[in-house]
UniProtKB/Swiss-Prot annotation:
Protein name: Putative transposase MJ0856.1
GO biological process: DNA recombination; transposition
Keywords recorded for this protein, A-Z: DNA recombination, DNA-binding, Metal-binding, Transposable element, Transposition, Zinc
Pfam families to which the protein is assigned, alphabetical: Cas12f1-like_TNB
An example Gene Ontology molecular-function term: DNA binding
Residues binding Zn(2+), per UniProt: 36, 39, 62, 65
Family: Belongs to the transposase 35 family.
Length: 109
């Protein structure tokens, strides 16, 4: 399945859902990875240090509540909240951030 396009996969998924009587809800994923699913604030992208340079990572961080996660995970959380009104599980905002992570203001200054 790793060689098929997203459109083909969605078609396959819709057919399987129809076969088993599962309702499919499609939504617009635009901007779902920049809003904190925990408090609703705008997220900032974290940076990693590599060879004296700050490179963008996939981690998104909320300076208001301390939530952080991979940007794809953030998008999934926000889509679940949008369509169900439920948060998938409690964020672990008190866990330590990965070693070598640099916050945006540290990377730019």
């Amino acid at each position: 399945m790793h060689n098929i396009s997203a459109k083909k996969f969605l078609g396959y998924l819709k057919n399987k859902c129809l076969e088993f009587g599962v309702k499919v809800i499609e939504g617009n994923p635009a901007y779902t990875s920049i809003k904190c699913p925990n408090c609703g604030s705008r997220l900032s992208q974290l940076y990693k240090l590599a060879d004296e340079r700050a490179l963008p990572s996939r981690l998104m961080y909320c300076f208001d509540c301390g939530f952080y996660a991979d940007r794809d995970t953030v998008a999934v959380f926000n889509l679940i909240k949008r369509f169900t009104g439920l948060y998938p599980f409690s964020p672990k905002s008190n866990e330590p951030i990965a070693e070598g992570t640099v916050f945006p203001d540290e990377a730019m200054g």
